[in-house]
Every structure is written in structure tokens, then in C-alpha cells.
Design a protein with these regions (language model features):
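N-terminal alpha-helical interaction blocks
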Residues: 1-25
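Short cysteine-rich clusters marking metal-coordination/redox-active sites
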Residues: 38-42, 66-69
Length: 85
């Protein structure tokens, strides 16, 4: 069980509590925006070698969560996985 004082917790409950997520491959949203970060550990998602290429995100792909942080926080945040389209 993750402790409430885990270093990765920085007010994400405001916008990530009880929301559906989907598993997705990261695709750059625009030519000028080539990466995102895990909302918890700050690991980088991008299409570049050495970065994360897939993980979990909000349905609109605004917020990304790496697989490790998803596993660590899924119970605390009560996430559900959306059905694949």
C-alpha cells in the first residue's frame, strides 16, 4: 500500500481521483509538442528512443501516468479502465 506521504503525491487528487483512464500508445499531440510527463514520477512519454512509449492516460489524453505509478496508485485513486473503442 502506498503511503499518503509518498514523494510522488502532489495534489493530483484534485484532478485524477475517481476518473476513467485508458491504456494508450503515446503520440505527439502537435508538431510543437513532442512529449508529456507522468503526473506522478515525471518520467517522460514521447516517441523518442529511451522514453516511455505507452502508459495510461485520461480519455482526452491530457494527463499521462506511467505503468509503475498506475499500479502503485490505482487503488488509492479508484481508477477504472475505459473500454477500448
Amino acid at each position: 500500500m502506498i503511503e499518503k506521504d509518498d514523494w510522488r503525491l502532489v495534489d493530483q487528487t484534485r484532478y485524477l481521483m475517481h476518473i476513467p483512464l485508458k491504456k494508450a500508445v503515446y503520440r505527439r499531440p502537435s508538431p510543437n509538442w513532442d512529449h508529456d510527463h507522468c503526473e506522478f514520477c515525471w518520467d517522460t512519454f514521447s516517441e523518442y528512443d529511451g522514453d516511455l512509449h505507452e502508459g495510461y492516460c485520461t480519455i482526452d489524453e491530457t494527463y499521462w501516468i506511467c505503468p509503475e505509478c498506475f499500479a502503485d496508485f490505482k487503488e488509492m485513486f479508484h481508477w477504472t479502465l475505459a473500454e477500448k473503442e
